[in-house]
Amino acid sequence: MPNARTGSLLALAGFGLATAGAALYGARYSRGKRDGWYRDLRKPSFTPPDKVFPVAWTTLHALIAYSGWRVWSAAPSRQRNAALRLWISQLAANAQWSKLFFGKPRPTLALVDVFALEGSIIAYIAAAHKVDRPAAYAFVPYAAWVAFATVLNAEILRLNPQLS
């Protein structure tokens, strides 16, 4: 019979796998797209170099998994369950953005999705804060990055009206 520590490590691995699965789902749509239509778009001057994105997202995905695991590890409660539902919703919205922006490509729908993503992140932070403060704080860099991504998405649409 597994002990509590083993169960906790398995849960952490599960959150890591769920987060990695969402990341891989999104990556399958963005892989190679940066060389196609995206490369030819007008982009704002503050667009980071392509090499920044994998570093940022790897760090953020680790924080996403860690935060979800911390909330899951808290004592069962309605607040914990509400936070976990929000964790799942942000993960789903996160996975959809790359499909909408790069896969379709439908940057206007991607902008709607990223607004929903940011809203679910903020709601998760508020819910997680009631359950486990470090879990909530772990999401702050993610919220900041997604806010930046929202501005970037909106600016790409503004600079490329043919995409609307």
Predicted features, each with a name:
Residues 1-164:
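Short amphipathic, positively biased membrane-proximal segments
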